Amino acid sequence: MAIVTLAELLEAGVHFGHQARRWNPKMFPYIYTERNGIHIIDLVQTAQLLTEACELIKQASSDGKKVLFLGTKRQAAGIVAQEAQRCDSYYVNQRWLGGMLTNWVTIKSRVSRLRQLEEQDKSGMIDQLPKKEAAVLRRELDKLRKHLNGIKNMTRLPDIVVVVDQKRETTAIQECLKLGIPTICILDTNCSPEIINIPIPANDDAIRSIKLIVGKIADAIYDGKYGQTDLEEITHPTQSEL
């Protein structure tokens, strides 16, 4: 049973791809037609693949597997953080630091430092230091929070990574390939499905499109962990996001 309707996908503008001249021929099987120089994505396949992704991730979540959401572009950053937190998953929504997965031992030490500084800040210890020393520690804390806040409770590598915008997150995807971590990725018409485990052909630029797809995946994770999704927790795009 599909977890999304074609009407929902259409309303969110999921079908709008990039300009035809910017396409990746490997996306040909997922393109329905070309209209006014713009590729139109086949939403039947989008619905099928999104359903497949959600079924897989729901089962994985039920089995205790951990998911990392990744989306650092402006349109995706807020959505990624919000939806990951809603389903108690990890996220990266600022710059991807090279080696976040392949050099996890080093990154883990920085995560530990973040937690240490947060504890010192909460206890008031930083406030008791001389102003210059306190300022240095606060700058360090702000920097660590910016890049690592979404993974500060991550104690091991994720089991699945959900990616918004393959072209932007190439480094992260290569790290997943190297480590054998499965990926689910929103793929626009300028991307390659060959390096992704489950591609979801869709508009990766429109806020409503990103919100719909990432939200459905978060719903599946929530369902896998806790049972039926609490509809009151699901947020919808505000008028300013449309």
From Swiss-Prot:
Signal peptide residue numbers: none
GO annotation terms (biological process): translation
Keyword Plastid: yes
Compartment annotation: Plastid, Chloroplast
Keywords associated with the record: Chloroplast, Plastid, Ribonucleoprotein, Ribosomal protein
Main location: plastid
UniProt xrefs under InterPro entries: Ribosomal_uS2 (IPR001865), Ribosomal_uS2_bac/mit/plastid (IPR005706), Ribosomal_uS2_CS (IPR018130), Ribosomal_uS2_flav_dom_sf (IPR023591)
NCBIfam families, per database record: rpsB_bact (TIGR01011)
UniProt record similarity statement: Belongs to the universal ribosomal protein uS2 family.
Protein name: Small ribosomal subunit protein uS2c
Annotated organism of origin: Pyropia yezoensis
Gene (name only): rps2
